[in-house]
Design a protein with these regions (language model features):
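Residue-level signal for short, function-critical loop segments
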Residues: 57, 71-72, 161, 211-213
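Structural recognition of the beta-strand scaffold that forms the well-ordered cores
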Residues: 65-69, 97-101, 154-158, 182-186, ...
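Bacterial Sec-dependent N-terminal signal peptides
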Residues: 1-14
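Primarily recognizes the serine-hydrolase "nucleophile elbow" in alpha/beta-hydrolase
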Residues: 129-201
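Short N-terminal segments immediately surrounding and downstream of signal-peptide cleavage
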Residues: 12-26
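C-terminal catalytic histidine-bearing segment of alpha/beta-hydrolase fold enzymes
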Residues: 231-274
Length: 274
């Protein structure tokens, strides 16, 4: 499938990734709606996956790259505080960022009971498409490493909430051409991810969550850490008490505000930054 490129009003490159919507019933275009705990709009009804490119300026470039997967329950994409704001912060650390708009549950199906057994059946089904978008994003960045001036062996993926589920599922299902070299699930929503073994190549993992998380994601986050640690894979878990779900890059005035700098220090410590 042909990959399309275009630029937004700020001159940032936006790439349309390969996709096949067989089995999905989209009606109408993408929709912008007021987001969860934010005054900025989130996107819904995303049927065409894209990545938006954020590159560090000049000599800042460390040749490290990160795919960023915003959250939103597979029904929305919180692209500002869990996407663009993250990308800009990564750029300041010399890391190239690629913000992913993965495919979401069709908007006309949100809130409808389809008589399926799993309480999150629509979201779980959508993960099968969303994780493919993440894998295609990694593959695209790796194939274009020279263009983006990055090291093809220093490509990470991070995601928030449902984006954390996309991050984990993509890692579990990855192959040599599209596997991440490291990953950072941030309060990952593991209820829609089946239990799986860490991949044999053992990518380093950095996990963040809080015990105050509205959706009780601390224990599943700890389980991910245990899975990695039991195999002696590089793994780090930052589990804070204070901090509600969905903080992203917003300040909470609690210790969890240090998560981003801690993550960058960890990326450096595992040899993926310099």
């Amino acid at each position: 499938m042909v990959i399309f490129y275009y630029f937004n009003s700020l001159g940032q490159e936006i790439i349309t990734l390969p996709y096949d919507n067989t089995g999905l019933d989209y009606q109408g275009p993408e929709v912008e709606k007021k987001g969860y705990l934010t005054d900025k709009n989130n996107f819904q009804n995303i049927s065409i996956p894209t990545i938006q490119v954020f590159l560090p300026r000049g000599n800042l470039n460390t040749k490290t790259a990160m795919i960023v997967c915003p959250g939103g329950g597979m029904r929305a994409n919180a692209i500002h505080h869990e996407g663009f704001d993250v990308a800009k912060a990564l750029n300041k650390k010399g890391i190239s960022a690629f913000v992913l708009k993965y495919r979401l549950v069709p908007i006309h199906l949100i809130g409808k009971n389809e008589g399926l057994d799993h309480p999150y059946s629509k979201e779980k089904k959508q993960l099968a498409y969303g994780h493919l978008d993440a894998l295609n994003a990694i593959a695209h960045v790796r194939e274009n490493a020279l263009k983006y001036e990055i090291n093809p062996d220093k490509i990470g993926i991070m995601g928030f909430s449902a984006g954390g589920a996309v991050t984990m599922e993509a890692t579990y299902k990855s192959s040599e051409k599209n596997r991440p070299n490291f990953l950072a699930p941030i309060y990952p929503w593991m209820k829609i991810v089946d239990d799986q073994e860490p991949p044999a190549y053992g990518p380093p993992i950095f996990i963040v969550c809080t015990t105050e998380d509205t959706f009780k994601l601390a224990i599943p986050s700890a389980r991910i850490y245990t899975d990695w640690a039991e195999k002696n894979y590089i793994s780090e878990l930052h589990l804070y008490h204070h901090g509600k779900h969905g903080f992203g890059m917003r300040k909470t005035n609690y210790p969890v505000d240090n998560w981003f700098d801690n993550m960058v220090d960890w990326i450096d410590a595992i040899g993926m930054l310099n």
